């Protein structure tokens, strides 16, 4: 009540109240705590009303190639020296042509450089072949995930008709708009998405230095934007291949070091091929799991109709039209031994779900334990049409409330299954998890998950973009992970999850939308949360500044922020590179 009376008084007596109050609220802990405890919108188990419009976070912005000094508030640890690199869509139209889907926007690279308590920001559009071709014609020339490029209006009717019959996988027509993630192979950094192409970048200048095509090295039609790494730098990924015997999923291994300075992914190998359960409808997947000894691939009922995809251009449809949620199919787990490339014989199934990001996986007592962010509805890709994300009022509320929410779940996959194990036996020996693996009459194993959360996470809208202290705890038993809460269509909070006690710590500031959290360990730490969390926090409010946030990873309290007076769109993934 005090704050409301005070607010009324200020507004009644000062024309500068709108500019003054946000600054004061950010700086004074008492007001910040009050605002944090004041409900800004009604939310009951994912049903939200009165969501603010976030369209400004999903519109074209200008790049900022010259470094901009940020205004630092609070404390940036002196040891925090390096660059937070992020990538995401930043341009959503060329001329009169507009993209349809969030995933389609042209890649914009962001760099927050931190040195001795100071922060400098800059951004550049990736000079991909797609970006340059679209810019030269001032229209969309190359199709993207949710947008079909229209025929050249300068061509005659016959030429435009015949252009419909160009296969979507033809190299000249395949996008190299790598806007999803930074990945590392042999010490170099690449921008990637899920096509054949990656773009090698100079992480200091943000300039593209080389375009790399997976299919020039191995027989794959693309790879994920979420590889995994062994301690020696060996990288593993998953790719696709379509041949005379149908569709298959490929486990890929990239060696850790270069033989020659000029090489890229030379020496890459396919170590295992997994046949698709349904030849004409393989699964769409975004990531996979890895332990010290095993790769875990999840074949989920989010299906790619190969016929629809192959004929998409003829039918005047985008690639995304060929992806559908088919809940009549169960989810299947495949386990591959990394050393030999052998696909293990166990057949593990669970009820239908969709996962985009795995949290972590590890081995214990002859089992693989894998933790995932899961959704029970596979229509998320449809939700992220730009027309949905840019809605306001009741229309926005309806889109959000109809969207599937993502929650952390644990599955157990027993590796050494006896042929004599009785039907109905739970084959998991693990006392610390309620996840079960029950043998069926046909020899398959039915896996039921354990929820790694309580009701409070439902009130936060679920969680996505999970991150851990990867270098030390990937593939090992762990205690914490970090992610974004989704009481909106984009992340509106940062969350620390204790997977052992199933408790949460939450950071939120009303009207601001944080990016995927990145954990940076303090020098010499062995603790899972001994460091800081970095996140880029943006707002649609033109009277406020976007900023990079630093949280103490242990107590999840703010240490500092560095404000940048530049418009930024909501992005996907990133990484921290120390110097």
From Swiss-Prot:
Domain of life of the organism encoding this protein: Eukaryota
Cofactor: Fe(2+)
Protein function: Broad specificity mitochondrial dioxygenase that mediates the asymmetric oxidative cleavage of carotenoids. Cleaves carotenes (pure hydrocarbon carotenoids) such as all-trans-beta-carotene and lycopene as well as xanthophylls (oxygenated carotenoids) such as zeaxanthin, lutein and beta-cryptoxanthin at both the 9,10 and the 9',10' carbon-carbon double bond. Through its function in carotenoids metabolism regulates oxidative stress and the production of important signaling molecules.
Co-factor: note: Binds 1 Fe(2+) ion per subunit.
Cellular component, GO, one term: mitochondrion
Expressing tissues: Highly expressed in retinal pigment epithelium. Also expressed in stomach, small intestine, liver, testis, kidney, adrenal gland, pancreas, heart, skeletal muscle and prostate (at protein level).
Organism the protein comes from: Homo sapiens (Human)
Protein name (database record): Carotenoid-cleaving dioxygenase, mitochondrial
Residues passing through the membrane, by range: none
InterPro entries cross-referenced by the UniProt entry: Carotenoid_Oase
EC number(s) on file: 1.13.11.-, 1.13.11.71
Protein localization: Mitochondrion
Reactions catalysed, as given in the entry: all-trans-beta-carotene + O2 = beta-ionone + all-trans-10'-apo-beta-carotenal; 5-cis-lycopene + O2 = 5-cis-10'-apo-lycopenal + (3E,5E)-6,10-dimethylundeca-3,5,9-trien-2-one; 13-cis-lycopene + O2 = 13-cis-10'-apo-lycopenal + (3E,5E)-6,10-dimethylundeca-3,5,9-trien-2-one; lutein + O2 = (3R,6R)-hydroxy-alpha-ionone + (3R)-3-hydroxy-10'-apo-beta-carotenal
Any one GO molecular-function label of the UniProt entry: beta,beta-carotene-9',10'-cleaving oxygenase activity
